[in-house]
């Protein structure tokens, strides 16, 4: 082979997968982030830029610590130390490890408030756990001309939700410098990614008083620096089918559980597209259609055995109505599709189900956004029924959910810094409430 031909062949082999990688990333993130690594501009030290910033260095510190759900103790210790060094009184709220995990870590929620102010009227809260696997923190210079704001920070938790944690802390510290008695508290919870155990624990604790001592809750999640006016509800259920096993050559001697469950799943799969009057799940102008995801399907032992059991798990994102109404619609749909078969069982094991959550947006200067993902917000019961002052709930944060939980999770320095301004604006509005 001629040298020129060899060079061309090698070039094609190298370029093709790279091009495919760019295309995939562009589709996944809709142009939000590019999966590229460009050398930094001359004389620009990315690590030094981070080290010179209180915000960026705090964010790096907590993102470099692995804190997959049920293993949050180390990042909790780092936050306790940092907040204690910056005039916060800190408390650990021990949270038992989830039953299905064998971790021996003593993990806990971090509750912090300015010294002498144990009952702050404003609470900023986010979560310190992440989904697996841990991905190392890394810095990536922008394409083309160097712009500090366009440095990309990648790694697990850099967006969801340690960006919110870091920005909240700095926003609170900035207010404390100007007004040491600002009534702001910080609550960083564990296990948001595993059902909200941390927030449920706080909700059930003596800190969640009736009536509340706080009048404003500011939640942190990736919202693209927009103020969220609400998110869909959440409901989960399982479908199980029973059959009778037999040799596949003589199927009439048995009864297929998979044949039982298939028409039921087909009916379930379309409930979000069917009008309510025809037996479907509700939609709304604000949240759009209710969506269903058949996340797992299991059944059978082998291809030559009539299956004696089958099951499926389903997640529902509710766009309107109550959990109870949705469950009734699902029950009727399953009964209709199965012909009332006693071989089909429907189970609603999730006692954490909730309807759509409407949030406050009465602070000027923000774009508004409605999101489909769930949060810890419905896990915190607010006991303000008999209070003259109703608790306001805001949801805001840097980064986009489109990259959260993915291999390219990340955000820009500019977005992280703008989040401090956004949280400060929300704190200012809350302070004016008294």
Curated annotation (Swiss-Prot):
This is Probable carboxypeptidase BDBG_01803. The keyword Zinc applies. It is found in: Secreted. The active site is at residue 192. CDD domains: M20_ArgE_DapE-like_fungal. GO terms for biological process: proteolysis. Binds 2 Zn(2+) ions per subunit. One of its GO terms (cellular component) is extracellular region. Its EC number is 3.4.17.-. Residues 1-20 form the signal peptide. InterPro entries: Bact_exopeptidase_dim_dom, Peptidase_M20, Peptidase_M20_dimer, Peptidase_M20A. Belongs to the peptidase M20A family. One of its GO terms (molecular function) is metal ion binding. Zn(2+) 1 binds at residues 160, 193. It holds the Pfam family Peptidase_M20. PANTHER family: ACETYLORNITHINE DEACETYLASE (PTHR43808), PEPTIDASE M20 DIMERISATION DOMAIN-CONTAINING PROTEIN (PTHR43808:SF8). Glycans are attached at residues 35, 136, 150, 343. Its cofactor is Zn(2+). Keywords: Glycoprotein, Hydrolase, Metal-binding, Protease, Secreted, Signal, Zinc. Zn(2+) 2 binds at residue 160.
């Amino acid at each position: 082979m001629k040298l020129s031909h060899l060079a061309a062949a090698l070039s094609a082999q190298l370029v093709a997968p790279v091009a495919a990688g760019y295309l995939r990333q562009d589709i996944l993130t809709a142009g939000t982030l590019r999966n590229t690594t460009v050398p930094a501009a001359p004389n620009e030290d990315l690590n030094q830029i981070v080290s010179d910033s209180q915000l960026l260095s705090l964010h790096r510190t907590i993102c470099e610590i692995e804190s997959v759900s049920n293993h949050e103790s180390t990042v909790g210790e780092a936050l306790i130390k940092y907040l204690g060094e910056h005039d916060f009184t800190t408390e650990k709220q021990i949270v038992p490890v989830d039953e299905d995990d064998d971790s021996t870590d003593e993990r806990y929620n971090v509750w912090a408030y300015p010294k002498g102010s144990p009952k702050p009227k404003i609470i900023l809260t986010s979560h310190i756990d992440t989904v697996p696997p841990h991905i190392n923190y890394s810095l990536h210079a922008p394409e083309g001309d160097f712009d500090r704001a366009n440095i990309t920070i990648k790694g697990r938790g850099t967006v969801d939700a340690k960006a919110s944690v870091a920005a909240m802390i700095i926003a609170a510290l900035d207010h404390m410098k100007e007004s040491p008695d600002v009534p702001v508290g910080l609550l960083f919870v564990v296990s948001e990614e595993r059902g909200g155990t941390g927030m449920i624990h706080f909700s059930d604790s003596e800190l969640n008083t009736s009536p509340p001592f706080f009048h404003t809750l500011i939640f942190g999640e990736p919202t693209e620096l927009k103020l969220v006016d609400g998110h869909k509800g959440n409901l989960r259920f399982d479908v199980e089918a029973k059959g009778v096993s037999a040799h596949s050559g003589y199927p009439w001697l048995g009864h297929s559980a998979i044949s039982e469950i298939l028409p039921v799943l087909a009916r379930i799969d379309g409930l979000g597209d069917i009008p309510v009057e025809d037996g479907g799940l509700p939609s709304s102008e604000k949240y759009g259609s209710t969506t269903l995801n058949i996340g797992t399907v299991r059944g059978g032992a082998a291809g030559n055995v009539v299956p004696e059991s089958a099951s499926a798990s389903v997640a529902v994102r509710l766009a309107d109505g109550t959990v109870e109404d949705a469950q009734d619609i699902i029950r009727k749909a399953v009964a209709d599709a199965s012909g009332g078969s006693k071989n089909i069982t429907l189970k609603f094991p999730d006692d954490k189900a909730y309807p759509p959550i409407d949030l406050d947006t009465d602070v000027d200067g923000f774009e508004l956004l409605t999101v489909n993902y769930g949060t810890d917000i419905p896990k915190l019961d607010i006991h303000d029924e008999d209070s003259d002052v109703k608790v306001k709930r805001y949801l805001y944060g840097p980064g986009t959910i489109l990259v959260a939980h993915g291999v390219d999770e990340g955000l820009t320095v500019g977005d992280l810094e703008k989040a401090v301004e956004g949280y400060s604006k929300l704190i200012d509005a809350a302070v004016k409430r008294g």
